[in-house]
Amino acid sequence: MSIDRILKQFLYKSIKPWQNKNIDDINQGEIYNIITNKSLTDNTINSVKRSFQNRLNENVNLTNVRKSYKKIKFVSFSLTKFYSNENNVFFVKLKIEIFVCDSFNTSLIRDFLNLITSEDILWIMYSVEPVILIHTDSKDKILQETYLKLECKAVKSQLYLNIYVIFDEKRVWTKNLVESFFSTIKNGKILNISNVPKLGGLCFCYVLNNLLLKANKKNQLAEIKIYQHTKYEIPSKYKIKFINESPLFLREYTGSLNFLYILLSMLLDNITNK
């Protein structure tokens, strides 16, 4: 999905001259004209937010879920003003958080992941910062209490992919569960995971690291932040960085010697295998 198409979808119901047009009839020049020659007022921005919110609510029924999880902010949307650079090229900065339940249409996530990973827009990635927050509340409680936040941005030629995972430390992870959890990453393709035992707590970060190592093919920098929480509080924080597919462990923890031991073991395993 092209950046033009995304902008059309966000702006379609907000720009009066476009309301009587078919969305596919809006050409690139008209988009440039709206972005570069007219200032988007707060009312327009709010209209875009409401439009997106309405589309979300068509796919997601949050009524019952909100009653159970009142402390969590499920759906939020922020959109900055549009602007142009010296070459008259417009950019958009988005921050989106989406709550996902069983009835959610996963194509929405995949479309947005296509947007942030598409080859034809990587050259403007340094000005695009999309964020997706996913929470799945399935009937069999798979992935319950688990959150995934994707944040993608680029600086010069370096693409930064940040993945934030907040999960219940008592959750037991299996190979199929991990595959299911990351099935929407990389344009919806399930990444291959081999020899993954039952996982719980800190061991999960090792599998996550392997996933990112396989995903990084263009000297990308991937950063993982893993949080353990009890009743939505975050007592411990763990951070692991990969630079050009070489692990650099940066630890931020509160008295967890066991976690330090795991990190050292992982580092030794990595050196031994090279």
From Swiss-Prot:
Identification of the protein by name: Uncharacterized 32.3 kDa protein in rbcL-atpE intergenic region
GO CC, any one term: chloroplast
Top-level taxon: Eukaryota
Keywords: Chloroplast, Plastid
Keyword Plastid among record annotations: yes
Cellular localization per UniProt: Plastid, Chloroplast
